[in-house]
Design a protein with these regions (language model features):
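Short amphipathic alpha-helices in soluble, non-transmembrane regions
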Residues: 95-103
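Helical scaffold of the NTase/Pol beta-like nucleotidyltransferase catalytic core
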Residues: 2-69, 229, 265
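Intrinsically disordered, low-complexity terminal tails and inter-domain linkers enriched
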Residues: 5-28, 121-136, 227-265
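Catalytic cores of NTP-dependent nucleotidyl/adenyl transfer enzymes across multiple folds
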Residues: 151-232, 236, 240, 254, ...
Length: 265
């Protein structure tokens, strides 16, 4: 039984909740692991089935370090969301050339960073039968390849902070962030910044929380009237964020989960 997971929300079919690695007093969540996905909601289990069928192991033979930093890792993905994987490799161009020969689409993003993209069909039957929408029957994968240590990259740092905020504020906050994701199309970072009243570029605003004690932050569940009358005036502007821009990182202060979710079968 995995007892180091935070468990939040349920999906539209009342299936098991989303899960993610909980923070500990001495360490932030470990996004290198995949095991927790097997105990999550249907989309998390679908991604686990695909990645553990050979994709992850194949990448691991080439990479010095890897991490899954998709919003799926914290249950905030939408149909069509990518599986974003950070890959540390000493020669990203060489890595890109090798995988381009295997059907991956490679593009040079500059700064010794390469992006590789490929779409895989779902392997689990429940995903394949989920509907006629192609986005729900396949997984787009994006590999961000760089020689930089993955824990210094924005993708790792953003996901760590978002997980800590979900753990800090719980299920109601999770549902409100997911509502903004699904109904208004906001990125996870932008949705959280709106709810917390953080102005400016949401990606930069979120990283500023690395220097703060998250226990000092406050958030109040909006009333139903607030949800329907909100004009979005406090919403941060839309910005593009690369998961691999590296800057000096401090360890976020994350509360420890008191939950011990029972894994699904």
């Amino acid at each position: 039984m995995l007892t180091d997971l935070c468990r939040l929300g349920t999906d539209k079919t009342a299936a098991p909740a989303a899960v993610f690695p909980s923070a500990s007093p001495t360490a932030s969540p470990n996004w290198r692991r995949l095991d927790y996905l097997a105990h999550g909601n249907p989309r998390q289990r679908s991604a686990h089935a695909l990645l553990t069928a050979g994709v992850w192991d194949e990448l691991a033979t080439q990479c010095a370090d890897m991490a899954l930093v998709s919003t799926l890792a914290i249950g905030l993905d939408r149909p069509g969301s990518d599986l974003d994987i950070l890959c540390q490799h000493p020669n990203p161009a060489e890595f890109a050339a090798t995988f381009a020969e295997q059907g991956w689409q490679a593009s040079d993003k500059g700064g010794n960073i390469w992006l590789l993209e490929r779409t895989f069909a779902c392997l689990d039957q429940s995903c394949a039968n989920s509907g006629s929408d192609k986005s729900e029957a396949s997984w787009p994968l994006e590999l961000y390849v760089t020689p930089a240590p993955i824990e210094t990259l924005n993708g790792w740092r953003h996901l760590t902070l978002m997980a800590a905020l979900l753990e800090r504020f719980g299920d109601a906050f999770y549902r409100d962030v997911l509502r903004l994701r699904l109904e208004e199309g906001l990125k996870g970072e932008a949705a959280m910044c709106r709810l917390l009243g953080l102005a400016g570029d949401p990606y930069e605003a979120l990283l500023m929380l690395e220097e703060r004690n998250l226990a000092e932050l406050s958030w109040q569940l909006p009333s139903r009237d607030d949800i329907h009358t909100s004009t979005g005036a406090a919403a941060p502007a839309a910005h593009y964020s690369s998961p691999v821009v590296s800057t000096t990182s401090a360890t976020p202060v994350c509360p420890v989960s008191t939950e011990s979710p029972i894994p699904t079968s």
